[in-house]
């Protein structure tokens, strides 16, 4: 009997669990159906198929901006390569090797190809790698990139903002020029790229690739990529999620880093003029893929992936900076219990926190003020006691000096009185002495006269 009751209860529990599970599945299915939009067929033409054309026309009217950061040692060919990439002489003056610090020089140009306008900003690292102490050579570059992110963030946070007219100066790509001399990456190169890989899209290029043979160049490429991977440096990978360009981008990812040669000089090869470098042993054609990877770089950088570089800068690198800055300011997407927070809730919580912090600071300042006042009062009282003691001492000394002077005065007056008495006595005596000789003379004269008679 007991076993039958147990089986009955177990069966009821199983039925209840199964029913609850089925109800949960039905509820989830209904929720998904509720959340997903319904697909409908229109009975006629509406016109929103022209949205892509509208977007293209608006973009062409607005124009585009593209910002390139060139990092590399002085004289490695940064300016020449940029001139060659855009087929323009940007008139950048040669830099000296004797700058005490690394500084960044940004120059903006307006370019137009057909009806497309491009605002191109080229940022050059002047004096990079020229100092004896290269420990902090990468810091000005990091500071510059962060400064551009901060400027864009401040524009975004304005109450009255105008991002449509704002000149976006955020760096979209960093062309990192690697010297072809040596057998591996320099420590400065590793430190710099490691510091920049989370802030900018890095495309490493081997500059002046005509300085080494093809065999050495291939070994050098393999060595560089191995060092980048082993040191955790994240370079820009051409995207493969778009089917139209996935195949060529995947192929080009295998050619990194690009070995490039730049030149604006034209040399006659056969029956045509080509951009090339003329050497005693022959000609290195810039746009010949058998000679260097310049064409690959131009195709990947400008023709195929320029918009992806701009998008990666905004959606990845800038978002990382923005999230970090907002978290430092106290803004969070979720609360303590992983509940979503609105901006108003975050603001109110932060305002309450700041209010409490202000109250605490005010209380601390009051206590500190009272403590300082007490300390000052104690110091003043001690100084007052010292002054009072000094005053009493001086008063006592003055009194003693006064008594001593009065005693001297009394003695002096007594001496004066005694002297006066002596003087008076002396004068009397002198007068008596002066009068006595006269009377005797008269007596003698009278006596003589009597005798004569």
UniProtKB/Swiss-Prot annotation:
Region annotation (G1 motif) ranges = 72-79
Q: Region G4 motif: what ranges?
A: 207-210
Modified how:
Proteolytically cleaved in vitro in a calmodulin-dependent manner.
Q: Where is this region: G3 motif?
A: 124-127
Q: Where does GTP bind?
A: 72-79, 127, 208-216, 262, 277
Q: Which InterPro entries match?
A: G_SEPTIN_dom (IPR030379), P-loop_NTPase (IPR027417), Septin (IPR016491)
Residues annotated as region Disordered?
A: 18-43, 433-453
Where in or outside the cell is it found? Cytoplasm; Cytoplasm, Cytoskeleton; Cell projection, Cilium, Flagellum
Q: Which GO biological-process labels does this protein carry?
A: cytoskeleton-dependent cytokinesis; protein localization
The UniProt entry's GO CC annotations, sorted and at most eight, read: cell division site; microtubule cytoskeleton; motile cilium; septin complex; septin ring
Every copy of the Septin-type G domain together lies at: 62-328
Cross-referenced SUPFAM superfamilies: P-loop containing nucleoside triphosphate hydrolases
Known CDD domains for this protein? CDC_Septin
Q: Which GO terms describe its molecular function?
A: GTP binding; GTPase activity; molecular adaptor activity
Which PROSITE patterns does UniProt cross-reference here? G_SEPTIN
Q: Which UniProt keywords apply?
A: Cell cycle, Cell division, Cell projection, Cilium, Cytoplasm, Cytoskeleton, Flagellum, GTP-binding, Nucleotide-binding
Point to the regions of Basic and acidic residues compositional bias: 27-37, 441-453
Q: Which positions, given as ranges, span the membrane? A: none
Q: Which domain of life is it from?
A: Eukaryota
Q: Which family does it belong to?
A: Belongs to the TRAFAC class TrmE-Era-EngA-EngB-Septin-like GTPase superfamily. Septin GTPase family.
- Give the record's subunit note: Septins polymerize into heterooligomeric protein complexes that form filaments, and can associate with cellular membranes, actin filaments and microtubules. GTPase activity is required for filament formation. Interacts with ADGB.
Its biological function? Filament-forming cytoskeletal GTPase. May play a role in cytokinesis (Potential).
Q: What is the protein's given name?
A: Septin-10
């Amino acid at each position: 009997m007991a076993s039958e009751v147990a089986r009955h209860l177990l069966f009821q529990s199983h039925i209840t669990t199964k029913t609850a599970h089925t109800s949960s599945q039905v509820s989830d299915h209904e929720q998904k159906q509720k959340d997903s939009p319904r697909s409908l067929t229109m009975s006629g033409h509406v016109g929103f198929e022209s949205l892509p054309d509208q977007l293209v026309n608006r973009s062409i009217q607005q124009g585009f901006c593209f910002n390139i950061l060139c990092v590399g040692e002085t004289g490695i060919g940064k300016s020449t390569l940029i001139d060659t990439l855009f087929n323009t002489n940007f008139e950048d003056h040669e830099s000296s090797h004797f700058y005490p610090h690394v500084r960044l020089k940004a120059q903006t140009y307006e370019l137009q190809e057909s009806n497309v306008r491009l605002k191109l900003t080229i940022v050059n690292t002047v004096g990079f790698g020229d100092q004896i102490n290269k420990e902090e050579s990468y810091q000005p570059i990091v500071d510059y990139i962060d400064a551009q992110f901060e400027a864009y963030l401040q524009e975004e946070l304005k109450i009255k903002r105008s991002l449509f007219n704002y000149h976006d100066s955020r760096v979209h790509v960093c062309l990192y020029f690697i010297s072809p001399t040596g057998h591996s990456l320099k420590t400065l190169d590793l430190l710099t790229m490691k510091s920049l890989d989370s802030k900018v899209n890095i495309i490493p290029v081997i500059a002046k690739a005509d300085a080494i043979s093809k065999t050495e160049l291939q070994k050098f490429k393999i060595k560089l990529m191995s060092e980048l991977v082993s040191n955790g440096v994240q370079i820009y990978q051409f995207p493969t999620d778009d089917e139209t360009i996935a195949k060529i981008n995947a192929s080009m990812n295998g050619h990194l880093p690009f070995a490039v040669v730049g030149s604006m000089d034209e040399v006659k090869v056969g029956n045509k003029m080509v951009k090339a470098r003329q050497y005693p042993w022959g000609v290195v054609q810039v746009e010949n893929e058998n000679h260097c990877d310049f064409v690959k770089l131009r195709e990947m950088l400008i023709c195929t992936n320029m918009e992806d570089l701009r998008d990666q800068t905004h959606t990845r690198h800038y978002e990382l900076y923005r999230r970090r800055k907002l978290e430092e300011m106290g803004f969070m997407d979720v609360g303590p219990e992983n509940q979503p927070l609105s901006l108003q809730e975050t603001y109110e919580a932060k305002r309450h926190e700041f209010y409490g912090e202000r109250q605490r600071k005010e209380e601390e300042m009051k206590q500190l003020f009272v403590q300082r006042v007490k300390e000052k009062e104690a110091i003043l009282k001690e100084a007052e006691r010292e002054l009072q003691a000094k005053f009493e001492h001086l008063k006592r000394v003055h009194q003693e000096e006064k008594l001593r002077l009065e005693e001297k005065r009394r003695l002096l007056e007594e001496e004066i009185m005694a002297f006066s008495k002596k003087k008076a006595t002396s004068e009397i005596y002198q007068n008596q002495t002066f009068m006595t000789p006269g009377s005797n003379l008269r007596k003698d004269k009278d006596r003589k006269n009597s005798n004569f008679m």
